[in-house]
From Swiss-Prot:
Ranges for the TPR repeats: 35-68, 72-105, 120-153
Function noted in UniProt: Essential for the assembly of the photosystem I (PSI) complex. May act as a chaperone-like factor to guide the assembly of the PSI subunits.
Pfam families noted in UniProt: TPR_7, TPR_8
GO terms classed as biological process: photosynthesis
The protein, known as: Photosystem I assembly protein Ycf3
Membrane topology: Peripheral membrane protein
Transmembrane intervals: none
Lineage: Bacteria, Bacillati, Cyanobacteriota, Cyanophyceae, Synechococcales
Source organism (scientific name): Prochlorococcus marinus (strain MIT 9301)
Record has Thylakoid as a keyword: yes
SMART domains: TPR
């Protein structure tokens, strides 16, 4: 196990050195370079489990980043942290912001649906079947969009949609 970990650390370090070299020599504005560095540092902190530090780096990156796709990716990473921290409403709000920046992120839709589906299961456990159906319908709505964007990529969700009777035939056309 340690040899695999050493190899992984070597690969991570090599990638970081290469990425930093590319950023230094690329003819891009200083502002964009700083945005990337904040994003990269946020990703490293997130991977190390330091979520509060990661969020700070991501927020700094967003202040500088102008590219919508990159902004969407940063917001998606922030939403993942909020979701991990149990801040579901903030997570949904942040995923929705990510989708405004880059509407072609099926993983954002998938994760919003996961929150809705969880809320539906909780309502069902509490005996509130009307509320369960509301949450499950919301999950189905966003999951259907995710499946359309990434056909075959979320087979478990496709199965849930079919088994729950919430699948629409046009989803597969």
């Amino acid at each position: 196990m340690p040899s695999n970990q050493n190899r992984d650390n070597f690969i991570d370090k090599a990638f970081t050195v290469i990425a930093e070299s590319i950023v230094k020599i690329m003819p891009i504005a200083e502002k964009e370079k700083k945005a990337y560095i904040y994003y990269r540092d946020g990703l490293a902190a997130q991977n190390n489990g330091d979520y509060s530090e990661a969020l700070e780096y991501y927020k700094e990156s967003l202040l500088l980043e102008e590219n919508k796709i990159d902004r969407g990716e940063t917001l998606k990473n922030m939403a993942i942290i909020y979701m991990s921290n149990g801040e579901e409403d903030l997570s949904i709000e942040t995923y929705e912001k990510a989708l405004v920046e880059n509407p072609k992120q099926p993983s954002c839709l998938k994760n919003i649906g996961l929150i809705y589906e969880k809320r539906g299961r909780n309502a069902e456990q509490n005996g509130d079947l009307d509320q369960r159906d509301i949450w499950f319908d919301k999950a189905a709505e966003v999951w259907s969009k995710a499946v359309r964007l990434y056909p075959g990529g979320y087979l478990d969700i496709e199965n849930w949609l079919k088994n729950s009777g919430r699948s629409s035939i046009d989803m597969y056309l």
